[in-house]
Amino acid sequence: MRRLSRNLVAICSTLALTAGLAACGGGSDEAGDAGDTIVAETAFNLKTIDPHRQFEFTGSTIDNAIYQTALEFEDGDLTKPTDGLCSYEMSEDNKEMTLTLKDEDAKFSNGDPVTADDIVFSFERLQGIKGNPSFFLEGVKVKKVDDKTVTLTSAEPNPALPYILPNSSIGIVNSKVVKENKGTTDENDGAEQFLNENSQGSGPYKVEKYDADSQVVLTANEHYNGPEPKYKRVVLRNVSAETQLTDIQSGQAQVAFDLNADQAKQIDESMGKISSLPSTRSLYIFNNTDEKIGGPAADPNFRKAVMAAIDYDKLTDLAGKGSQRMASLVPNEFVGAVPKDEAPERDLAKAKKLLKKAGYDGEKVPFHYSSDQAVNGVDLAQLAETLQAQLKEADINLDLKPAPSSTQLDGFRSAKQPMGIGTWGADFPDPTNYNVFIPGGDVADRVNWKDDPKLKKLADEAAEAKGDARDAAYAKLFKATTDTAVWIPLVQPVSTIAVGSSITKFVSNADVSFDFAKAE
């Protein structure tokens, strides 16, 4: 997925750069020399831009510019969903949401007005075609009440729903046109190719050209009911991080999404600006609780010794400027995050005392990780080697077990790995997305963590909490989860975006990594 972040308020960078709006170098209107064209570059993770099927970063980035959603997050503040195309109200029991069409002047790219029928069709299509994001509205009954009102009803309390609806995978499409082009609300839907080439949104842009291997071109939606974008054309190109660096330096591109910390340091003020935002990814150590599999890792004292032996400040140095300590797996900007000042601290003396309690005598513990994966610039192989060296200082011996990502993921899912590095990217900015780590959850099953009465009680209390009380209730739950050291939070990496000097103002925040429509 793409967005998310929690804790307080917005992590919003509306940055005014000092450079003028000079034209960029290059020989064609797709190379950055046209004053109304913005060239952005990323290593594509793209399968489709059909909003109800896409679930990858690049597709989400594109659909954010094409489609509007019923609700949205204002200025990147993921703790407070706000009105989008609709306003909303939740019932007292959190089982029913009422959406009221608010933006009655919103129009699709062909000039058709956005209606309640379009909202119902979009939600039901998301559910019915069974694409990757269909789980967002699983179990939700969608009903049109009148021309301005839609209700979403869940069998169980669903307080996360307002945090789910802003996702670009729930973009509102022109139901009439999509139906005319093989669109349905079941698995017989055949509109994907049409939507890849003929977007049907009401956002600031529409698709002009779609090539999942090389580039996607967007042009301004002349019927957009919002401020007219300064850049009428967006060219998103599929290139490596190395090429992105040279293109930003030379002015051939204005936005680069994939530079790591070392590459970002090579952008000086004459070339552009670096925007660093907390990512919504969590890096952690997992410990198998089954003694037959986990060995020492199944012992709470050993796990807590590992947690006390880690030098977390050095991990943030490794992750780069802007990365953060974590007190739980919930990112610091989310509702339910545990305050950073409660994060684990290094204490080697404490670690050695705990090891003595555990009866650990220096035996090697297999430590698994993906050898070919980097998460927001953090190379997991380098992270594993760093942890191995740090834990060695407490006389803990890790036996590194690198494997390709696909192999490692299968191994983790098998629940047969003693220890290792795990990663998690939020699907939506709500703490319920982390319930999978609580005993009985899907991810907890991977470490054979079946039951914990204390956590079950806290989880039940959090599920019953309403409104502002949810923040404290979930923070209490996930602090207690960290205290078990089954999951040891390591670092929250940073998302780095380079913006060329020809752009003098832009918005980049936790919800939308770069807002093309607001760039100047």
Predicted regions and their residues:
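Surface-exposed binding/hinge segments that line
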Residues: S134-T184, K209
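Ligand-site clamp/hinge motif
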Residues: D103, A220-Q266
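Detector for C-terminal structural segments
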Residues: D33, D211, A220, A309-G336, ...
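Aromatic- and charge-enriched surface segment that lines or borders ligand/interaction sites
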Residues: S87-G131, V145, T151, P296
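N-terminal lobe/hinge region of extracytoplasmic solute-binding protein
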Residues: E41-E92, E124, Q200
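Structural transition elements
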Residues: Q324-A358, A374-L380
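Ligand/substrate-recognition segments at binding pockets and active sites
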Residues: A212, K356-A426
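Gly/Pro-rich hinge or "lid" segments in bacterial periplasmic/extracellular proteins
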Residues: S168-G226
